[in-house]
């Protein structure tokens, strides 16, 4: 589904905005600090319930206001859906879908699958395993209907188990948690492994187009010994876990490793090449979703020209257009995106939180 209309109130430096959007490319042009990234962040927040630049709600709500309000209209082939999110300074949220309250943020995420490409997005490649787990979990969330509930239950059980490790003296006292934890861990790991295998060819093909000078490999590590039963791992590791006061092995320690010519990509690629790789991975993931489910992503790209030369920008623009997805791009200068515009695209000028088309 594409976002045809966006209303923003008291979000970052934007007091009020009402934007009619293109189902294709939408460009946000303005100087640094003008508010163009805030528009991207508002869209992201509408689909995720949280901002991507700050987890502190006070920094997202406009100065001296009590709450932000976001509203969007989504248009699909067969239906139109209205979505809304309000969040106050206490962090209390109201999610509204088609006029009714009481919905969950996960429902917004299902309606609005997004791929975010920002200058800070290098964390996907060099920021540690949790960011690469999140990459896999995004795919599992949108491809496996039971994933979100299982993942939420896993987080809850791990938190309870870790708390219990501070109190118990014998493994038998932990067994009730592990009886629930083990099947969830194995199911989530199987979903991640299946997804990483299914998308491998898409990633390899897209990366070969963006970075033909490198041989890239991808491997999923589930977070405990490959041939070991997870129940045995937990029981054998009880004394170590009790000393650490947390569970040392499991799906919460999984990783998705990416290597270039046999070495970690963060040690091999330049910043420009890392951005290309990040773009390739996000594109491959979005295209895989479309092929498997018929749904298209919204692509949010902040500071489009950063780290990319003209040829690389042209390649990325070409691939994005081929997806027939809705794309939002911020840039400091219109010159950087002129070759991406067409009769169906829209360009917005952003200046001190004011947005005009």
UniProtKB/Swiss-Prot annotation:
Pfam families: SMC_N (PF02463). Keywords: ATP-binding, Cytoplasm, DNA damage, DNA repair, DNA replication, DNA-binding, Nucleotide-binding, SOS response. InterPro entries: DNA-binding_RecF, DNA-binding_RecF_CS, P-loop_NTPase, RecF/RecN/SMC_N, RecF_2. GO terms for cellular component: cytoplasm. GO terms for molecular function: ATP binding; single-stranded DNA binding. Signal peptide: none annotated. Its main location: cytoplasm. It is found in: Cytoplasm. One of its GO terms (biological process) is DNA synthesis involved in DNA repair. ATP binds at residues 30-37. Gene3D superfamilies: P-loop containing nucleotide triphosphate hydrolases, RecF/RecN/SMC, N-terminal domain. The RecF protein is involved in DNA metabolism; it is required for DNA replication and normal SOS inducibility. RecF binds preferentially to single-stranded, linear DNA. It also seems to bind ATP. Belongs to the RecF family. NCBIfam families: recf (TIGR00611). This is DNA replication and repair protein RecF. The gene is recF.
